[in-house]
Amino acid sequence: MVFHRLSRLGSRIVKELPRERHLSMCGKRILQRSYGQYLQSSPMLQRQTRSFKEALFSNNHKFCTSFSTTSEKGGEKTEKINVTFVDKDGEEIHIKVPVGMNILEAAHENDIELEGACEGSLACSTCHVIVMDTKYYNKLEEPTDEENDMLDLAFGLTATSRLGCQVIAKPELDGVRLAIPSATRNFAVDGFVPKPH
């Protein structure tokens, strides 16, 4: 019940936010004044609502959020890094990747043959890439246990192997070179290459 009311509150806040480029809202008064009507309940639910209000508006808890609606289309450019993919034939493909995007998405947007059968849900190893320079590999966050479990299934595993869906572009990775292994374990035997999702 409390979750339902909180989700209604959240969706109402989002709907009523002004169409500005950036907005920050902090403090309990905003919620009490503008959105208190959504926290009111019928007499049957009064006790639960009171507990919810106390938890939400107590002095120990504060509500604070901010968001930005800026985009590249709005005139502001997104920071990009240079990434080089080296395919199985040794051909180099240079692309620019927006900071914050994962390597699998970047490959798909640039028609680079990196499968990603599970669409980045850590359920396969088909987006396996090899970071060609340990200097860049050391700048990456440590792989999670889930990623390591999937990497154990990857074809041609190396000490600098990662899943493309888990490598997020950040400024310190500018210039990284990634090798795409010659095969993955999910490709069909007849050579059929599935289209990116």
Swiss-Prot record:
Residues noted as binding [2Fe-2S] cluster in the record, renumbered to the chain: 118, 124, 127, 165
Any one GO cellular component localisation term in the record: mitochondrion
Co-factor binding details: Binds 1 [2Fe-2S] cluster.
Boundaries of every 2Fe-2S ferredoxin-type domain copy: 81-184
Transit sequence range: 1-74
Keyword Nucleotide-binding: no
Names of required cofactors: [2Fe-2S] cluster
Function: Associates with the adrenodoxin reductase MFDR to form an efficient low potential electron transfer chain that is able to reduce cytochrome C.
Stated family: Belongs to the adrenodoxin/putidaredoxin family.
Name the record gives this protein: Adrenodoxin-like protein 2, mitochondrial
Record organism: Arabidopsis thaliana (Mouse-ear cress)
Gene: MFDX2
